[in-house]
Curated annotation (Swiss-Prot):
Catalyzes a proton abstraction reaction that results in 2,5-elimination of pyruvate from 2-succinyl-5-enolpyruvyl-6-hydroxy-3-cyclohexene-1-carboxylate (SEPHCHC) and the formation of 2-succinyl-6-hydroxy-2,4-cyclohexadiene-1-carboxylate (SHCHC). It comes from Escherichia coli (strain ATCC 8739 / DSM 1576 / NBRC 3972 / NCIMB 8545 / WDCM 00012 / Crooks). It comes from the Bacteria. Monomer. Keywords: Lyase, Menaquinone biosynthesis. Pathway: Quinol/quinone metabolism; 1,4-dihydroxy-2-naphthoate biosynthesis; 1,4-dihydroxy-2-naphthoate from chorismate: step 3/7; Quinol/quinone metabolism; menaquinone biosynthesis. This is 2-succinyl-6-hydroxy-2,4-cyclohexadiene-1-carboxylate synthase. GO terms for biological process: menaquinone biosynthetic process. The gene is menH. GO terms for molecular function: 2-succinyl-6-hydroxy-2,4-cyclohexadiene-1-carboxylate synthase activity. Pfam families: Abhydrolase_6.
Length: 252
């Protein structure tokens, strides 16, 4: 079994760009940014429980990494950069710490490296279980209306929130719930030490209005790019800024 994805081919000899979306997104999420790099072959992946991979369920991050490896092999991707946002960024960090053959580097936008103590994990587990129950039992429009009121999305205006609620409500609540439970931050290990000892290139993107993830970025041994005029979802709020950062990274 492999993950559903959309592949677009560029010039031979350049590494692939493999894009991983955030929670409740899909393979289209990164395409406005990715299509600015037409010289590179691009793979836009649907994570388990999402888009064309909605019917795929996993028990945890190990399963996601295994599916990602098999998907890369199926497309004969031998050299690549991983680019992930939020949940996709966490998947990217987990997978790279576990080892991915052919990895050139990882670029994470607003991805959490992991909670650092049992109290934080217990609190996050309580919170995520409440969201899981809501995704299972309530209309998605109601759930996402509250989801986008969370402090991390404080930079969004009312129109942006309405647009995101409408877009994300096309998902399947049950498969979102299953993926949220399987990949909760509560069950993700703290990756800071592994990321510090890495042998691959590591870049971190965060919006200038995303104070939480700017603080987290400062804890990581990564080259950080702050995206102007953007909050947590920087590639949506300022795609040109993210394109500029990726272009700078890929020139090295």
């Amino acid at each position: 079994m492999i993950l559903h994805a959309q592949a677009k081919h560029g010039k031979p000899g350049l590494p692939w760009l493999v894009f991983l979306h955030g929670f409740s997104g899909d393979c289209h999420e990164w395409q406005e940014v990715g299509e600015a790099f037409a010289d590179y072959s691009r793979l836009y992946v649907d994570l388990p429980g999402h888009g064309g991979s909605a019917a795929i369920s996993v028990d945890g991050f190990d399963d996601v990494t295994d599916l990602l490896r098999k998907t890369l092999v199926s497309y004969n991707i031998l050299d690549f950069w991983l680019v992930g946002y939020s949940l996709g960024g966490r998947v990217a960090m987990m997978a790279t710490c576990q080892g991915l053959a052919g990895l050139c580097g990882v670029i994470v936008e607003g991805g959490h490296p992991g909670l650092q103590n049992a109290e934080q994990r217990a609190e996050r587990q309580r919170s995520d279980r409440q969201w899981v129950q809501r995704f299972l039992t309530e209309p998605l429009t109601a759930v996402f209306a509250d989801w986008y009121q969370q402090p991390v999305f404080a930079s969004l205006n009312d129109d942006q929130r309405r647009e995101l609620v409408a877009l994300r409500s096309n998902n399947n609540g049950a498969t979102l719930a299953a993926m949220l439970e399987a990949t909760s931050l509560a069950v993700q290990p703290d990756l800071r030490a592994n990321l510090s000892a890495r042998t691959f290139a590591f870049y971190y993107l965060c919006g200038e209005r995303d104070s939480k993830f700017r603080a987290l970025a400062a804890e990581l041994a990564a080259d950080c790019h702050v995206i102007p005029r953007a909050g947590h979802n920087a590639h949506r709020e300022n795609p040109a800024g993210v394109i500029a950062s990726l272009a700078q990274i890929l020139r090295f």
